[in-house]
Design a protein with these regions (language model features):
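Anionic coordination/interaction segments
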Residues: 1-140
Length: 140
């Protein structure tokens, strides 16, 4: 009998995105989001990463060097906490995926009947990241 391997990632049909299905692949999978002003955000499949500024000579100035970029979700009734991208709590979720695309990264997971989505992108100008965060309670 042939063993079925769990798919870690795949590229979308248009080739613009890499979708990662394993929150803990053998190595981090980073997306680099940047703009014309030199702001760059490094985003892993868990959502963490560094932010920095590159000047015209490509000198790097670190803005966020502690890799911390996490959202915590808590269900008080179930007394359970977790993260969309698994880390740093590393609690098991029912479903998980990270889409690294041109211009954004999106992490999605479901746990305890709560769907969560977190999108990160860098605007065309300025020195900031924009995060959009959505929750949907699918339970009664």
């Amino acid at each position: 009998m042939e063993r079925m391997e769990k798919k870690i990632y795949e590229f979308t049909n248009d080739g613009n995105s890499c979708v990662i299905y394993d929150a803990k692949p053998p190595r981090y999978w980073f997306n680099y989001l940047w703009n014309e002003n030199g702001y760059c955000a490094q985003v892993s499949q868990n959502g963490h990463g560094r932010s920095y500024y590159l000047n015209e000579r490509a000198d790097m100035c670190m803005i966020n060097n502690n890799d911390a970029r996490y959202f915590y979700i808590r269900d008080d009734e179930m007394n359970k906490s977790w993260n969309i991208g698994a880390a740093p709590l590393n609690e098991q979720v029912e479903s998980y995926q990270c889409e690294h695309s041109i211009g954004f990264s999106r992490l999605q997971s479901e746990c305890q009947g709560i769907e969560s989505s977190w999108r990160i992108f860098v605007p065309q100008t300025g020195f900031q990241e924009v995060w959009t965060f959505r929750l949907r309670n699918k339970s009664d």
